[in-house]
């Protein structure tokens, strides 16, 4: 092996040269990985819109392996103009030579010849219709053998019609041609058969829709039309001497009673044959049979009708299973295998399917052995062809057409001793064909027809022709020669590499551990002209096939840059001798993994010379890729015994820190505490290199930390995995203890179990009776203690007055007093029921469902027609306060009368003094004083006879009644509790709740979301106590007790245990206002006497005290008239002279 002299390249050219090598490698390895040369296609074009290429066949004139043979391609053009006179679109058969020209095909004479010797073509007869007969819809050929068998060509026109009186019958016809494409005979298998019932007989036979020429000189024609499109096949002997051959036409049973398929099955849409069961059999596709399609296999027989051997079923409705058939020996066992296409098969990502039934000891299985599928809407399998042995492995290969994948694609699948490979060896796309297109239009519907298994360029490899009818084109792809190569590696230094010892034989001064191996190959001679080949080889370490993202070793390229992929070009002699090239690699510093071998891949590819102008001039060879690469590995020196194989036995024990456990069942009450998992890992055998422990957990469980002390180093690898390093290596007979803390607070409410998958691994080989893995299951219990209470604001309410407002119609519009629309304050006092939930924990309540049964109205039969007697009239939808949530109640129960807030706008009311505007239902004032003003009216009036006076009188009474209500300040209140204590009378109490059937109750549902421990939520229900209902129904009771009931629970789906029973009742007490009842003012006589006596004693005591303090002593001024001494007094003296003891009295 001679490496190219890179050292002679100038420095400024090295980069360019290396880039060229990489480009060559990439092109060779990825672009053209098989031997059909799509870069140099030979394209033949027909007339536009003629459907040229709808059918194709490779053909050899002369003996297949003879010296004077002529290779050509036969192309059907069903809408082309035939050479027969008086026809325009009857279809034609074309013969295309093996040249590079586009337009050198010649039409083969088919129609119009009346006898063998005449060259004159006659127009169609009066009893036939050739227009649109689709001559060339089917073209088949088989090679001429040395014994004289084969070499025939069949071309059909399935729409050919003949005329009987005024009726036209589309029975179809086929021409059998000789090896040199001369007319031999015409086949019309349906001619002369009954047509009285039109399509129910043979009126639309359509013979020639499919055809096959078998290797036993048998011709099989398919006709899907007989007997209401049941279909049939026709088998005829076409080989050998005419006088000696069997001229009987054998057919399948298509009668109403015995046909293997039902009407509209299209049996005969495709045909093939082979020795599937050790003897000759014929297969026919019925793509519409049973809806999913079937393939019926008939045995060869000398009796009519030929017997049915077996039936294969499709797997999907409407998939057209059996639309196309092919026979090939895909595993080289000399037993034919059956391939069935279902081009209309589909899934969300697939369009079209091909099923392989591999022959096993002369038996076809009823279930397919391999299924191939194509891209969506590609109609993968619309064409199938046995294309021969492309790679010389004695197994025939398969071509599958997908004409509607883009502009068309053909897939090449290689056979092997194990069967057909499921991965295509080559994908030929119309958009990637090389060469020049003469009309500038891209080729479309590429792959509508395929033919092969003929060596058209005489290089001993079969070639392929592909039709594209939408572009009126046929594409010939020639097969490139395959060079056989043997690849090997000499790798002595790759055994027991010591990462602690630097250098190697080829680089002893290196500071890194290095190694050297030799890449070798040998090429057998394949051509006398080529004695030497340029090969590109690459050595890749560890990153191929996605083994690793980074490699532990590297190479130096020509620019001394580190790389794990080394690429070079060498020259190799094609003399079968082995030639080698040395490759030196280096181990990276601080490499931890010394247990796993280092894997390498050596791969060779051919550096091609420039393409020739034509595939007919020269085809560049291609390496056999199955032998062009080899994988090998290098091992490290380890302390693992003489066999250099480390066998470790890791044992895991797991235990959580949960005291509440039963056997292997653990239960954790979810609160603020953490979960600790104690893990013991023991190694009972050889040292475990890169020993690691992994704990997989749910995303809602978070890793907190690892408790100390421990020899392991743990980290969170991602949100669901904790990775711990146990040592490198973990020595024999050692145990590592790890305690890991987890916080389960993030678990979803639906997660009721914590699952931990705990496992250990090592780069050493694991041995032992069981794998080092354990599963820990911890049941999660959420408990929440809900403290549920409720109360009413106010607890007591009062009602009085008349029941005139009880009418729903009056309330909704205008009350009878004519004061305008009713308001909330007009119907009754406001009542609030408060429901409070307190979560005492320990767990969060993700959702609390509260259901309130609300006494909406008194019970009444809905069919009675009575108006609704509201009880607690809902003002609005209840609300959730303090916490998140909402309540739901049917809309028809929330303020159905559309009452506005406040009171009606009565002019008399608005003109009254502010201190007198105390309406009976103004609860904000009356509740605080525990006082509700009476609604009873006091008025008097005389009766009026006329209606107008009566109306005016009513209005006056209303005004007086209203003013009396709002101005009267003195009220006679009734306290039932004190009354009972005083006189011991029995109370008349009414209880209204949802459990006794006396009320119509509304269901209010409230959802309270996400209540953490020690949080509170409150639901407020605002309503009005409907005054008129109580006045009309309970005017003389002691009190009315109205209950709303509520329950609170957490849905079971959240897995939270509620520790208390949460059912409560909230009561509103309604009292009648008894202002007209007489007070009991009688006082016992004893109390009167004691009162008088007590009063007299008190008076005497007060009098005595006053006497003591001199209250009764009076001091008067000096007055002579009082003493009886009268004397005359000077006028100078004052009229009143003060005495000695003068006291001034003011």
UniProtKB/Swiss-Prot annotation:
Topological region Cytoplasmic: 1107-1146
Residues passing through the membrane, by range: 1086-1106
This protein's GO CC annotations: apical plasma membrane; basal plasma membrane; external side of plasma membrane; focal adhesion; integrin complex; lateral plasma membrane; plasma membrane
Keyword terms of this UniProt record: Cell adhesion, Cell membrane, Cleavage on pair of basic residues, Disulfide bond, Glycoprotein, Integrin, Membrane, Receptor, Repeat, Signal, Transmembrane, Transmembrane helix
InterPro entries: FG-GAP, Int_alpha_beta-p, Integrin_alpha, Integrin_alpha_C_CS, Integrin_alpha_Ig-like_1, Integrin_alpha_Ig-like_2, Integrin_alpha_Ig-like_3, Integrin_alpha_N
Listed Basic and acidic residues bias regions: 942-952
Keyword match Cell membrane: yes
Mapped FG-GAP repeat ranges: 38-105, 121-186, 193-245, 254-303, 304-366, 367-422, 432-494
GO molecular function: cell adhesion molecule binding; extracellular matrix binding; integrin binding; protein heterodimerization activity
Membrane-protein topology: Single-pass type I membrane protein
Subcellular location(s) per record: Apical cell membrane; Lateral cell membrane; Basal cell membrane
Name of the protein in its database record: Integrin alpha-PS1
Organism annotation: Drosophila melanogaster (Fruit fly)
């Amino acid at each position: 092996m001679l490496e190219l002299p890179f050292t002679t390249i100038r420095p400024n050219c090295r980069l360019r040269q290396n880039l060229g090598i990489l480009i060559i490698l990439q092109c060779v390895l990825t672009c053209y990985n098989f031997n059909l040369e799509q870069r140099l296609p030979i394209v033949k074009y027909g007339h536009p819109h003629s459907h040229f290429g709808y059918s194709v066949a490779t053909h050899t004139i002369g003996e297949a392996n003879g010296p004077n043979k002529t290779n050509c391609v036969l192309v059907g053009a069903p809408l082309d103009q035939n050479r027969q006179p008086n026809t325009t679109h009857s279809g034609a058969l074309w013969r295309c030579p093996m040249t590079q020209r586009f337009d050198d095909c010649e039409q083969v004479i088919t129609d119009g010849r009346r006898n063998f010797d005449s060259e004159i073509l006659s127009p169609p007869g009066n009893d036939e219709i050739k227009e649109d007969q689709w001559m060339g819809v089917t073209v088949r050929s088989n090679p001429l053998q040395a014994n004289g068998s084969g070499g025939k060509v069949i071309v059909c026109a399935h729409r050919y019609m003949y005329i009987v009186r005024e009726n036209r019958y589309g029975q179809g016809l086929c021409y059998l041609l000789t090896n040199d494409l001369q007319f031999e005979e015409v086949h019309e298998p349906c001619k002369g058969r009954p047509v009285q019932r039109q399509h129910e007989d043979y009126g639309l036979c359509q013979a020639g829709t499919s055809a096959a020429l078998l290797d036993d000189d048998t011709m099989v024609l398919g006709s899907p039309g007989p007997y209401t499109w049941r279909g049939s096949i026709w088998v005829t002997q076409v080989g050998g001497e005419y006088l000696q051959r069997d001229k009987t036409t054998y057919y399948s049973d298509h009668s109403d009673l015995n046909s293997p398929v039902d009407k509209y099955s299209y049996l005969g849409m495709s045909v093939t044959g082979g020795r599937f069961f050790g003897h000759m059999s014929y297969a026919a596709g019925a793509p519409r049979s049973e809806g999913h399609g079937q393939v019926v296999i008939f045995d060869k027989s000398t009796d009519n009708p030929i017997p049915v051997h077996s039936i294969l079923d499709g797997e999907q409705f409407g998939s057209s299973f059996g639309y196309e058939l092919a026979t090939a020996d895909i595993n080289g066992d000399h037993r034919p295998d059956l391939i069935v296409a279902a081009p209309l098969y589909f899934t969300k990502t697939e369009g079209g399917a091909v099923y392989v039934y591999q022959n096993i000891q002369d038996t076809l299985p009823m279930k397919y052995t391999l299924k191939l599928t194509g891209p969506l809407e590609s109609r993968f399998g619309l064409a199938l062809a046995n294309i021969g042995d492309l790679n010389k492995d004695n197994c025939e290969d398969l071509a599958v057409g997908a004409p509607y994948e883009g502009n068309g694609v053909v897939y090449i699948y290689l056979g092997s001793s194990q069967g057909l490979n499921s991965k295509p060896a080559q994908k030929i796309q119309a958009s990637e064909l090389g060469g020049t297109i003469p009309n500038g239009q891209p080729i479309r519907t590429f792959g509508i027809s395929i033919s092969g298994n003929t060596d058209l360029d005489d290089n001993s490899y079969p070639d392929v022709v592909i039709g594209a009818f939408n572009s009126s084109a046929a594409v010939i792809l020639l097969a490139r020669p395959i060079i056989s190569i043997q690849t090997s590696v000499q790798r002595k230094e790759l055994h027991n590499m010591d990462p602690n010892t630097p250098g190697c034989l080829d680089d002893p001064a290196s500071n890194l551990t290095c190694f050297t191996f030799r890449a070798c190959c040998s090429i057998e001679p394949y051509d006398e002209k080529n004695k030497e080949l340029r090969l590109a080889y690459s050595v890749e370490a560890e990153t191929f096939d996605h083994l690793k993202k980074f490699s532990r070793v590297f190479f130096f390229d020509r620019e001394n840059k580190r790389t794990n992929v080394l690429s070079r070009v060498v020259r190799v002699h094609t003399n079968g001798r082995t030639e080698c090239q040395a490759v030196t690699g280096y181990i990276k510093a601080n490499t931890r993994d010394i247990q796993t071998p280092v894997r390498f891949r050596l791969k060779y590819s051919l550096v091609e010379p420039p393409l020739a102008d034509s595939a007919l001039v020269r085809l560049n060879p291609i390496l056999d890729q199955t032998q062009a690469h080899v994988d090998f590995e290098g091992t490290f020196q380890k302390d693992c015994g003489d066999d250099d194989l480390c066998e470790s036995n890791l044992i895991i024990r797991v235990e959580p820190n949960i005291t509440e456990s039963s056997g292997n069942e653990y239960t954790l009450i979810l609160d603020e505490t953490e979960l600790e998992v104690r893990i013991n890992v023991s190694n009972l055998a050889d040292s475990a290199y890169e020993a690691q422990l992994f704990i997989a957990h749910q995303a809602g469980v978070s890793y907190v930390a690892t408790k100390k002390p421990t020899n392991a180093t743990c980290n969170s690898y991602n949100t669901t995995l904790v990775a711990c390093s146990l040592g490198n290596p973990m020595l024999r007979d050692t145990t590592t203890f790890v305690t890991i803390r987890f916080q389960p607070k993030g678990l979803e409410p639906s997660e009721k179990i914590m699952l931990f998958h705990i496992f250990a691994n090592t780069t050493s080989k694991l041995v032992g009776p069981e794998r080092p893995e354990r599963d820990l299951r911890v049941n999660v219990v959420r408990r929440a203690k809900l403290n549920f209470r409720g109360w009413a604001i106010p607890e007591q309410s009062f009602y009085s007055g008349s029941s005139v407002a009880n009418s729903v119609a009056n309330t909704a519009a205008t009350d009878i007093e004519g004061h305008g629309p009713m308001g909330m304050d007009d119907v009754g006092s406001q009542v609030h029921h408060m429901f409070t939930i307190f979560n005492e924990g320990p767990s969060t309540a993700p959702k609390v469902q509260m259901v309130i049964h609300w006494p909406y109205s008194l019970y009444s039969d809905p069919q009675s027609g009575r108006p609704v007697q509201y009880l607690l009239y809902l003002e609005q939808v209840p609300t959730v306060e303090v916490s998140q949530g909402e309540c739901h109640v049917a809309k028809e129960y929330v303020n159905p009368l559309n009452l506005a807030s406040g009171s009606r706008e009565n002019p008399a009311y608005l003109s009254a003094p502010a201190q007198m505007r105390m309406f009976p239902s103004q609860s904000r004032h009356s509740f605080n004083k525990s006082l509700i003003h009476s609604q009873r009216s006091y008025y008097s009036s005389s009766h009026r006879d006329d209606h107008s006076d009566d109306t005016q009188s009513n209005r006056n009474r209303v005004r007086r009644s209203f003013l009396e209500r709002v101005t009267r300040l003195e009220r006679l209140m009734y306290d039932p509790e004190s009354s009972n204590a005083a006189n011991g009378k029995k109370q008349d109490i009414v209880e209204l709740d949802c459990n006794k059937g006396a009320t119509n109750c509304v269901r209010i549902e409230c959802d309270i979301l996400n209540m953490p421990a020690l949080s509170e939520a409150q639901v407020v229900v605002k309503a009005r106590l409907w005054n008129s209902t109580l006045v009309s129904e309970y005017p003389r009771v002691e009190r009315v007790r109205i209950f709303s009931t509520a329950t609170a629970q957490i849905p079971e789906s959240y897995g939270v245990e509620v520790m208390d029973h949460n059912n409560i009742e909230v009561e509103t007490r309604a009292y009648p206002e008894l202002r007209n009842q007489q007070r009991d003012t009688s006082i016992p006589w004893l109390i009167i006497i004691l009162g008088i006596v007590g009063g007299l004693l008190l008076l005497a005591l007060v009098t005595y005290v006053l006497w003591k303090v001199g209250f009764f002593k009076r001091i008067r001024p000096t007055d002579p008239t009082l003493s009886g001494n009268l004397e005359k007094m000077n006028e100078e003296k004052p009229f009143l002279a003060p005495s000695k003891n003068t006291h001034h009295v003011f």
